[in-house]
Amino acid sequence: MRELVKLVCTECGDENYHTTKNKKTTPDRLEMSKYCPRTRKYTLHREKK
């Protein structure tokens, strides 16, 4: 079953994005390079615990 997760910017701490993930196939935390509107650049976004 897919679960909704929030992605948090590692530089400013904002929750800019949300996505779904399958916990059976990807048990570890997601890390994606996404655009952060506050810092106005692409930064690493990690899954919020």
From Swiss-Prot:
Keyword Ribosomal protein: yes
UniProt record, GO biological process: translation
Top-level division of the source organism's lineage: Bacteria
Pfam families hit by this protein: Ribosomal_L33
Gene3D superfamilies to which the protein is assigned, alphabetical: Ribosomal protein L33 (2.20.28.120)
Family: Belongs to the bacterial ribosomal protein bL33 family.
PANTHER family associated with the record: 50S RIBOSOMAL PROTEIN L33, CHLOROPLASTIC, LARGE RIBOSOMAL SUBUNIT PROTEIN BL33C
Protein known as: Large ribosomal subunit protein bL33B
